[in-house]
Amino acid sequence: MTPPSSSSHFPSPSSANNDFHSLSLEAHGSLSDKFISQFRLNYTIIPIAQKSNISLPFLTLSPCSFTICSLRARLHSLHGPSTVFLKRETSQISARVNDENGFTASPSFFSVDCFDELFPTLSTTDEQPKEPSIISISSSSSDPSSSPPPSSSLLKTPDNDFCARPETFVKSDTADIKLQIHQNNLVLTFLDTTTVSKVNIVLEIHIPVLRDFVTFEQYIPLMFLPSPFETILSFDNLKSDSPSSDLHLGWDHTVSKESMSQSIAEVLNPYNKGVSRSLNDATNMETYHWSPFPPQFSTFNDNALRLRIYYKPKSWLPKNSSCSLSVDVKATLLETTPPSCEVSYNLLLTCRSSNRFRLFPASTPNSNGLCRNDSKCRFLMILPETIIKSPSSFIGDSYNIANIDPPSSMNVQSSEFRVGEVQSFTTNTSSFAFTFKEIVQLGSKASVPMILFPAPSNYKLTIEKPPFPCDLTIPHTAINDSWLPMKLKETNAISYYRKTCSSCKYPFQFFINKLPFYQSPSLPLSATYVWIASALLSVQPGNGSFNIMLSLKFVSSMKPGTELLTIKQPKSSLLNWGLVNGYPKTEGRIVLLPRNDIVLIQADQPTSVFDLCWTIKPTYEKSSNFSCLQLPIPVLNTPILTPVTINIQSTTYYLIGYANQNSKKTLDQPTSLLVLGCKAKNVSELILSYLPEKPIPDGAPIVTNVVETNKTNEAPSSFRKCLQQFLVFLTFTGMTLFILYQLTFPYGVAKDNSSFIDTPLPHSCEMEKSLNVLQHKVLQLQAVNMKLHDYYEKEPTEIYKTVSVTSTQIMPAVTKMSSFELEREQFHKAFGFLRLNRKKDDNAN
């Protein structure tokens, strides 16, 4: 297949921009010895006459980092050809006007508005910028390997050029063309095209050679290529007999969608297959010539295409490694404010023989492919910038660390990381240790140095002396897939080890989260302990039934086979399915008792995740005026606060319940709820939260039945409708969640300051002493109501706060435990079976 030609498949280049007759670009590149590629960009621009203020972006400045070494602009006008030459390494500006007549004068035809960004060494200001600007600036005069390619006649600078000062070019009102930076592009603006017939621009730029750690290939980014030009691309490479070192066009697939990658591959394949080569025997350089890219080819840039030239250098990695590497990461929690931990990374490298290493591109292998005696053995790793800058990080005396790529390289798609190459001197069998340390706050990410080569034989992550409880989160990696918990030999540590020892493709990060708790146990912990790290309760209403899913994450030091917890079956439900650590093999881990209760058994690993699903079918009971759904929120007999996430997947259901008064210190505020009195320090643990039908503005009187000098504020109609439709009332007596459905009780004035709302219990159940706990919780709302009234009078803006996220996390208060079995019998006797069919209920009434 031959590459598509612009004449057969695409319009002429002039149609890409109606303001120009022709836009063409010749881009020729070559490699140097220090991970730098050199490009010469030759632009030919022919504008359309009788137009003014035409802007043309011709060089994209970001996100690719490069250095502009020189710029030459040649203007063809009615007054004759004129040339401007700007060169970085000599800090010199040269100009010639009307070359044919030998006349030299100030270049008033050319104006530059971006000297500070392009050539800071030529800037008229005394103060230099502290940080590099959009374009990466680095001096090339001291580096002989970064010298520009052989100059053409266009690049040659006459000896008698007029040496102009920078201010001569800046903001000239009489200029015909102007050079600017606009929206991260180098832009050429034609102020008047009546006298300009043609413009030639030659740019010399240096671009770093980067490395893709997904394909382990080196590449030269081509994001700087402009979009409206017909581009002819060529590149010089050292002649090689190995097909693996051939150049080919590719793209940054890490930021491309899978569906789009296929279409891009179909476009690039003809260009790679139809590439032509020419060999220069004198220099042993082979030049690759790709077919011209039409202007429409750059349309892929808008779809996140990152065009690159890839090549595979020979012996990029050692073929046979005789080194072993072990990595031990420890996180020690510190008693600081805010809470933080010290993360230390200990790397132990043992080299048995350095002569078995093949070399990296910076060195030259001998005839037998082994290292020379003066070569150094190396391994590569990705280092976070915070570690490099940390004063507590150090490396052994027999090692030095160097950057194989520029510090601002995009190899890992993040400026937070740097690719490091660690070199060791030639030694016999020996071991060396690397230690890096950093302080991170709890809940923030800690970045572990990623070892690209050699693959670690042992990778362990340990949290020492955690508070009770403490959780570990590893993003972008399934912990059951790549990392597994380690059997605890100590009672005051949580350990994980990496399942495989292959090279990691992405920088490894983890989060250490301190879960909220009421009481910190003394350390070290007891020999046997169990805690629920997290619990997720999801209610999914369906057609005539409910699906209730409960997910529990346990951390336990119990022996495998030990009973962890008994979970009561939800009322009128059947167990649908169960999973242990994501697998349906639950034999010996989930036991269903004859009374349909569930017993969870300790698995082989200290961290276990149990997923349970029940299906509840609707039943009916005419004697009661509301129905109750009892759901399981298990809790252990410990003074530990278990975080429970409640997720009700419906837009017609509303929540009313508890929120922890100290929730700002422990977790985010309950979301999708209007939180009342969240800042009141002297309010009890019971805080009312509900979701109104419509957003209520700040200061609206929404507190119901407030006693104020014999005056009562009634609840808004939206709040009444909310209660009549659906309520979720959370009471953590026995850690049980009650859903109250279709409440039909009246709204009356508070009687004797003893009730917040009229008791919703049927008269036949009022004498049931076993329900006093639930009724007492309802009556406690009146006390909260009074506290809220005080705050409403003083600080109304502190009482009402609206948040708008779709999930909620409720932290239960620790109360006296009651018997699950007793509650089950009492509620069955009081309310009968579950009734959820509203339509039938309305007809019955």
UniProtKB/Swiss-Prot annotation:
GO terms for biological process: meiotic cell cycle. Residues 132-145 have a biased composition (Low complexity). The chain crosses the membrane at residues 726-746. It comes from the Eukaryota. It is found in: Membrane. Keywords: Meiosis, Membrane, Transmembrane, Transmembrane helix. The keyword Isomerase does not apply. The keyword Transmembrane applies. It is a single-pass membrane protein. Has a role in meiosis. GO terms for cellular component: membrane. This is Meiotically up-regulated gene 4 protein. Residues 122-158 are annotated as: Disordered.
